[in-house]
Every structure is written in structure tokens, then in C-alpha cells.
Amino acid sequence: WYSSMFAANIKQEPMSHHHNHHHDNGQHSNSNSDGSPRQSPLPSPNAPATQLEQYLKQQQQHQQHQQHQHQQPMDRCCAAAMTPSPSNNDQNSPGLPNPMQPTMPASMRPSPQPTPTRATAVATALQTGDKLQLTPPMDVTPPKSPAKSQQSSVEPEKEHDLMSNSSEDMKYMA
């Protein structure tokens, strides 16, 4: 904000000398208002700055250490992931895939679980809607509304079965 105002004032300086004088006053007030807070926090950030530097250095060392540790298991994980059998993966490196596998279904699980609830909610809504629709059209068009109701009720059931199977498979995988 300050740099943009400064640039705008610089552009307007040759146009009017009075505006330049006003800009000097603004600079003076800005320098005073900015200088007093700058001077007061400066001693306090000095100590955290060194702490932050040390902390960042520790983090970098820790990250390098982690990366160096994880390079071999990551390659092993990728190679084991290339092989389709998870049992070999468990036997090769028992420590790593166990945290890896629950995290995968845990991230995958919330997506299948809300969808069956949505499918069941849609199925119940369709069933209630079909019940409401069935009573009036039974007199007018009996064959069409039951066909619609059967199709609409069968589709969410299929989706729900697929989703439940996938979630069960994920649970079995975990």
C-alpha cells in the first residue's frame, strides 16, 4: 500500500509542487508512525529471529534426515506398490506399509461412506416419492409409474451395493 501510494505521488510530483509538499508531510507522518512501532518490536524479534533460525536449521536437518531415511523405504514402497500382492509388501517391510495402508483407506473411506448414505437417502426419498406418485397415477397410468419406480429404486440399490462392496473391500484391505 505504501509503495503504491509512493509511486503514485512520484508520478504526480512534476504536475504540482503543492502536492509534493503535502507528500513530504505524509512521508514525515508515515516515518514517525512506522518508526516508533519498528523501534519497539525490533529488540523482541531479534531473540525470536535467532530462535527461528535455529528452529529452521533444525527443521532442515530433520527434513534431510527424514528424506535420507525415507528414500530407501519409499523406493521399496513404490516397488511393492508396483507388485499387486500386498502380502509381500507386508512381509518385505512390516513397519512402513502398515501406516501407509490405513491412511489410504482412511482417506478413501470418508468418500464411500457419505455416498452410501446419500444413496440410501435418495433411495428412501425415491421410495417415498414413488409411494406418493403411485397413489394418484394408479388410476390414470398404472404401467408407467411402477416401471419408473422400479427403475429408480433398482438404480440406487445397485449403487449402494457397489459402494458397500467397495467400502467392505477397503476395510478388508486395511
Curated annotation (Swiss-Prot):
Listed Low complexity bias regions: 27-36, 58-72, 116-125
Annotated region described as Disordered, given as residue ranges: 1-174
Biased amino acid composition, Polar residues: 47-57, 84-95
Compartment list: Nucleus
Compositional bias (Basic and acidic residues): 155-174
Keyword Aminoacyl-tRNA synthetase: no
Coiled-coil portions: none
GO MF: DNA binding; zinc ion binding
GO biological process: segmentation
GO cellular component, one term: nucleus
Highest taxon above the source species: Eukaryota
Principal subcellular localisation of the protein: nucleus
Alphabetical keyword list: Developmental protein, DNA-binding, Gap protein, Metal-binding, Nucleus, Repeat, Zinc, Zinc-finger
Family the entry assigns: Belongs to the hunchback C2H2-type zinc-finger protein family.
Its job: Gap class segmentation protein that controls development of head structures.
Protein name: Protein hunchback
Gene name tied to this protein: hb
